[in-house]
Amino acid sequence: MDNAPPEVRNHVFIVEDSAPIRERLGALLRDIEGVSIVGEAGSVRAAVEGILRTRPESVVLDIQLLDGSGVDVLREVCPKAPEVVFVVLTNHAHPQYRRICMEAGASHFFDKSTEIGKVREVITGLGATRH
């Protein structure tokens, strides 16, 4: 029997201004085999610096942040790290926000109040495609 830890196939960075929600997302994602949380941030500045430093495969991103918007993160990071998959998870799931986020480089856009389970599905799927 092989007792080696599972291979990490998806390094994830979480960007969320609410610490309790960040913790909940971390717990939800850490439970997925092959996923490793490589960083967390609650502000635009910390998110941009952390994402560019850790180069995760995917980022779970809120729109409302302590010092600005998740759209600012998308506009700053996507040109520098186009390989990163951004999954926007927000309470502001209006069509105009969806359009703006997708145009700025997001790959997925979900409503935090009704679609949090879809984040798990996407992150699981990303890990499954990387082996």
Q: What is each PLM-predicted segment?
A:
Residues 1-11, 117-131:
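Non-catalytic signal-transmission and effector/linker regions of two-component phosphorelay proteins
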Residues 16:
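Conserved acidic carboxylate
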Residues 43-46, 69-72:
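Acidic catalytic/metal-coordinating carboxylates
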Residues 54-60, 65:
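Active-site beta3 strand of CheY-like receiver
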Residues 66, 94:
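The feature encodes the CheY-like receiver
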Residues 71-81:
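Short amphipathic alpha-helix used as the core "switch/output" element in two-component signaling
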